[in-house]
């Protein structure tokens, strides 16, 4: 399945049994049969007829504003429903011991993958610090304590980024991102979130019931939980590569008063390489066959379902390459 990116302002509408993107000077026909995501990075006019058509075709539509900040997603009605699984999801949230167990596994997976990013870069002192923090995961008594532990680990991790990239970083700033590296992280994390959200939609999991992040209105918090595991592998490694290979430069960023954002050219570079990353293949050690990177997300969700159903303990994806 393909992902379609829209960077030009215009109107997206249904035309017979396909899509038409009407720009100021041309009309582009967009076949829908092999598309599962559409990303919009510009002003776009659409109507309910289009949304109904996208829902029929099970196509997700993701919106980013002028500055490349994630605004939200149109997600079709759930195609795979399981009342029993929903009950089990809720049970694991309401039972604090079960919730904490799952939340710990998300953090453990994330910190393992963070450490792997540093192992070959001779950051032995930081790796040792991460090991100490990971040893404390099983001792945490609350979600708040666990998230505080994760925050300390990420700070130690981010302290290496200026040396790895050669770019100014300082500290992590999200709303708004204070410099180019922070803008890249925020943009990449938003892209990862949408990938996980789409994969959740392909299962019977409810994306609003989560364990590490607190469920709340107006967000699919389970996608945030699972994305923690994959951000170090799909996003952080890509950022290092784009900068170290000089594919992204500081000219790919603009500053608006008190924050920095990717230009359209910068976003195009990132999404192109991000798509290629998702399509890469790796020999899966357990399945003994090559699978695409983005398939790792779906496999992780299936493992989570088995855990919720009491069939098998959940073990998050831990990068081995």
Curated annotation (Swiss-Prot):
Naturally occurring in which organism (per UniProt): Moorella thermoacetica (strain ATCC 39073 / JCM 9320)
Molecular function GO terms recorded: DNA binding; DNA endonuclease activity; metal ion binding
InterPro entries xref list: CRISPR-assoc_Cas1, CRISPR-assoc_Cas1_C, CRISPR-assoc_Cas1_HMARI/TNEAP, CRISPR-assoc_Cas1_N
Subunit structure: Homodimer, forms a heterotetramer with a Cas2 homodimer.
Residues annotated as binding Mn(2+): 150, 213, 228
Keyword Hydrolase: yes
HAMAP family: Cas1
Any single biological process term in GO: maintenance of CRISPR repeat elements
Annotated Gene3D superfamilies: CRISPR-associated endonuclease Cas1, C-terminal domain, CRISPR-associated endonuclease Cas1, N-terminal domain
Keyword Nuclease among record annotations: yes
Protein's name in the database: CRISPR-associated endonuclease Cas1 2
EC numbers: 3.1.-.-
Role description: CRISPR (clustered regularly interspaced short palindromic repeat), is an adaptive immune system that provides protection against mobile genetic elements (viruses, transposable elements and conjugative plasmids). CRISPR clusters contain spacers, sequences complementary to antecedent mobile elements, and target invading nucleic acids. CRISPR clusters are transcribed and processed into CRISPR RNA (crRNA). Acts as a dsDNA endonuclease. Involved in the integration of spacer DNA into the CRISPR cassette.
Membrane spanning residue stretches: none
Family note: Belongs to the CRISPR-associated endonuclease Cas1 family.
Keyword terms of this UniProt record: Antiviral defense, DNA-binding, Endonuclease, Hydrolase, Magnesium, Manganese, Metal-binding, Nuclease
Cofactor (UniProt): Mg(2+); Mn(2+)
């Amino acid at each position: 399945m393909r992902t379609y990116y829209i960077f030009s302002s215009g109107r997206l509408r249904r035309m017979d049994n396909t899509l038409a993107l009407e720009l100021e000077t041309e009309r582009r026909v967009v076949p829908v049969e092999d598309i599962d995501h559409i990303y919009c990075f510009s002003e776009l006019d659409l109507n309910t007829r289009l949304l109904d058509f996208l829902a029929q075709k099970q196509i997700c539509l993701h919106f980013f504003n002028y500055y490349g900040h994630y605004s939200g997603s149109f997600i079709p009605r759930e195609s795979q429903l399981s009342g029993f699984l929903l009950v089990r999801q809720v049970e694991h949230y309401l039972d604090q011991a079960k919730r904490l167990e799952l939340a710990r596994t998300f953090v453990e997976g994330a910190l393992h993958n963070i450490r792997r990013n540093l192992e070959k870069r001779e950051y032995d002192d930081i790796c040792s610090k991460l090991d100490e923090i990971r040893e404390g995961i099983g001792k945490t008594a609350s979600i708040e304590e666990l998230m505080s532990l994760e925050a300390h680990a990420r700070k130690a991790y981010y302290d290496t980024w200026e040396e790895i990239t050669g770019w100014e970083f300082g500290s992590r700033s999200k709303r708004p991102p204070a410099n180019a590296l922070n803008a890249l992280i925020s943009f990449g994390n938003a892209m990862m979130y949408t990938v996980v959200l789409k994969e959740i939609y392909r299962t019977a999991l409810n994306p609003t019931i989560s364990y590490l992040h607190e469920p709340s209105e107006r967000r699919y918090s389970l996608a945030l939980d699972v994305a923690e595991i994959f951000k170090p592998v799909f996003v952080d490694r890509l950022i290092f590569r784009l900068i170290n290979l000089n594919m992204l430069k500081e000219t790919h960023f603009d500053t608006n008063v008190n924050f920095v954002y990717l230009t359209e050219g910068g976003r195009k570079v990132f999404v192109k390489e991000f798509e290629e990353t998702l399509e890469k293949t790796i020999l899966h050690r357990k399945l003994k066959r090559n699978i695409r990177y983005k398939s790792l997300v779906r496999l992780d969700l299936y493992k989570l379902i088995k855990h919720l159903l009491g069939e098998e303990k959940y073990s998050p994806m831990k990068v081995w390459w």
